[in-house]
Amino acid sequence: MEQPTKIVSVAALPQVRVLGRTTGTDVVNLFWTGSGIEFIYTGSEIQVAVNADYDAYEPWLAVELNGVQIGRVPLNKGKNEVCLFRGMTVGKPKHVRILKEVQAMHQDPGHLLQIVGLQYADGEFQQLPEPKYRLEFVGDSITSGEGTVGAIYEEDWISAFFSAMNTYPRMVADALSAEYRVVSQSGWGIVTGWDGNVENKIPPFYTQVCGLLTGERNASLGALQDYDFEAWQPDAVIINLGTNDATAIQSAVELGQEWAGTRDVEEVKEILTTAICDFLKVVRNSNPTAQIIWGYGMLGDNFLSAIREAVEGYAEQTADSRIHFLQLPDTTPDTVGSRLHPGMKAHQITAKEIETYLQELL
C-alpha cells in the first residue's frame, strides 16, 4: 500500500465538487453549514488537509462514505490532517462527502475553516454524477441544525450541538439527489433576532457570499463579496424564517414593551408583512425561475397566520404561481433535541414533508 504523498489542491482536481457558498480556489473557504467537498476516489486511503481557527466556537467536520456518516470531528487551531478512510480495496470507487457541521459564526470573527487539499497515493478520481436538482435553504437555528446533537437536557450554546448532517436540508437534498446550499444563522429572523436586536436579520445579507460574518480576515477571504447567483441557480429556494421574530415580538407583548416603536400587534404584523414581501422580491430577482417555498411551524405556530397571509398575498399580488407557503410539522416531546430545539427525528419528519411537496412542484 502506497502512503499518501503531497497535498493536492481542490483546484487541481476537476472531479472534486465544491459545496456551498464558498470563496477561494487553491484554498477553499467554508463559511456556511453544509459547505464542503464531494468526490469519488478509487484508492485505499485518502486524507484531507484543513486549516482551522476560532476564538470561542471551534469548527467541526463530518465525513460521509458511500452515503453513510462515518466520522465527526472537532478541529484544532492550525493545520489538521484528517484521514477519511484507510485500508480499503484499491480500484473500488468510494463516494466521499465532507461537510462543515457548524454554522457561520457571526459572533466569533476568529472562526475559520479552509480546505487546503487532499493527500493520496494509489487511486484515481472519477467524475461525479450530475445532481438532479439544486436546492437552497434559508433559515435560522433550525436550519443550522442547532439541537440535532446532544442530550435533551443540554443547554450550553456550543459548536458540538450543531450538525449539518442531521438537518432537513441535507435529508431533503439527498432524498431528491440534489446539491444544496444553506444560508442560516441561529437566533436571527426576518426583521429581528430572538432578543429583539433588529440588526440580526437574514434578508440584508442574502445577496452576499456570507455577509453576516465580522472581522478583517473574513472580509479579506471574500465573505462580504456579492454572491454570484448566475453561477448556481437553484430549482427551489426553501425559506424557514419567522420563529425568532415571533419570540421577540411575543416577549415584548408579554412584558408590555414597545417593539419597533409600537405596542400594537397589528402594526407589528404589518411590519413583518412588509419585510416578508421585500425579501421575497429579492429572492425572486436573484432566482428568476426557482420555486420558492416559505415553510414555518417547527417551533410553534405563533404568527403563523400572519406569515402565511404575507407569503400568499405577495404571490397573488405579483401573479407569481411559483411562490408557496408550507406549514411544517411542530416539534413534540418525542422529537425535541438539545437546547429545546427540534431534534433529528423532528428534522426527519419535516424533511419528508418538504420532499413530498417538492416532488409535486419540480
Question: What is each residue range found by the language model?
Answer:
Residues 32, 148, 154-265, 298-308, ...:
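Conserved SGNH/GDSL esterase-like catalytic core that processes O-acyl groups on lipids
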Residues 134-138, 143, 180-184, 235-240, ...:
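Structural recognition of the beta-strand scaffold that forms the well-ordered cores
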